[in-house]
Amino acid sequence: MSLLQFSGLFVVWLLCTLFIATLTWFEFRRMRFNFNVFFSLLFLLTFFFGFPLTSVLVFRFDVGVAPPEILLQALLSAGCFYAVYYVTYKTRLRKRVADVPRRPLFTMNRVETNLTWVILMGIALVSVGIFFMHNGFLLFRLNSYSQIFSSEVSGVALKRFFYFFIPAMLVVYFLRQDSKAWLFFLVSTVAFGLLTYMIVGGTRANIIIAFAIFLFIGIIRGWISLWMLAAAGVLGIVGMFWLALKRYGMNVSGDEAFYTFLYLTRDTFSPWENLALLLQNYDNIDFQGLAPIVRDFYVFIPSWLWPGRPSMVLNSANYFTWEVLNNHSGLAISPTLIGSLVVMGGALFIPLGAIVVGLIIKWFDWLYELGNRETNRYKAAILHSFCFGAIFNMIVLAREGLDSFVSRVVFFIVVFGACLMIAKLLYWLFESAGLIHKRTKSSLRTQVEG
């Protein structure tokens, strides 16, 4: 890449970054937090944060990258995607009408809410316990990270339930919403994330997500400022780099350490070059249509229920890894959101996907506002826990693609909804057995005096 070509790419990158950052800043000033702000920051991180890192790798370490015209296509496709997404998100689908009291779809009380978070936590802890009994601490047993996807590891399906510890702790926080509950959320979820990091053998997702949710709650409540958020972001990047070194068993120093930091940070937070690789092989792609979305559900179907289930699921990430890159190392390489749309339907699917994503984020914001207006604090805690708990799925949306997001968000909704139903059923059984007594002011006064 020549200096002139880099200058052209830099101008496009700067314009796109300023465009998205400006819109995000205005939205932040208006709302402080909503899921449009979160997705916009996530989109910036995924598709634009990596460009400076790539530039340093090219000019400092002479690393080979896709041709400049392909990198330009990747930057422009990301900028155009966001423009269509933003217009869709801001488009009002129906006229604003005065709030009319409606019969709520469901209600929650104190016992049901506490039962819900206990069940969610129980699912996570039991899954971790069973996985540990089968495999032990994989971080200290395996020689390479790719081995966690091999037949040596049993009970892999249980990992999908680990994440429900975070929604459980979110319910606990939203029931109190004070600084002590906020700090308890951080300590409990990060400790659980470190435990799963050692047991699973290097998966950092739970730690990243817990830390991100903690920061956004702090921003919403005004407990941390923007400069503190920036400092925490830098600390998070350094922390993820250190965990990556431990995961891959690397011991580096000097120039090698700087080089390793650049490419690991880029691959962890901003895999935008994967989109460029996909566009570089555009003519070799056999468009998959909506099949990757359907195929991604296969992993949630037990083999005993479907004996003939394909062992290798050809979703967009695996298609990109196996068919486009001809990489069979055992690791799936993230195609990114835009890359998954290209795999499914080419360039035409990029604006269509942007419209779909705009509607998805609009729905989450509607649900979040519903929780903000809710007068029943127990129901509000459940709604907020569901919304913030879905942040993991939004990260999957930006990094892995639309197909992975759809399967995971459906799984999340089903499990979360099942926990609600079980909690309500248990409450009904306890109430029928006379085990639940309503609190009265006189009983509370007696407890205080005693």
From Swiss-Prot:
Membrane-related topology note: Multi-pass membrane protein
Transmembrane stretches, start-end: 6-26, 37-57, 63-83, 118-138, 155-175, 181-201, 207-227, 228-248, 341-361, 378-398, 410-430
UniProt entry keywords in alphabetical sequence: Cell inner membrane, Cell membrane, Membrane, Transmembrane, Transmembrane helix
Pfam family, one: WzyE
GO biological process, one term: enterobacterial common antigen biosynthetic process
Any one cellular-component term (Gene Ontology): plasma membrane
Pathway field: Bacterial outer membrane biogenesis; enterobacterial common antigen biosynthesis
Matching InterPro entries: WzyE
Subcellular location per the Swiss-Prot or TrEMBL entry: Cell inner membrane
Stored HAMAP family: WzyE (MF_01003)
Similarity remark: Belongs to the WzyE family.
Described purpose of this protein according to its UniProt entry: Probably involved in the polymerization of enterobacterial common antigen (ECA) trisaccharide repeat units.
The protein's assembly and partners: Probably part of a complex composed of WzxE, WzyE and WzzE.
Name of the featured protein: Probable ECA polymerase
Classification of source organism: Bacteria, Pseudomonadati, Pseudomonadota, Gammaproteobacteria, Enterobacterales
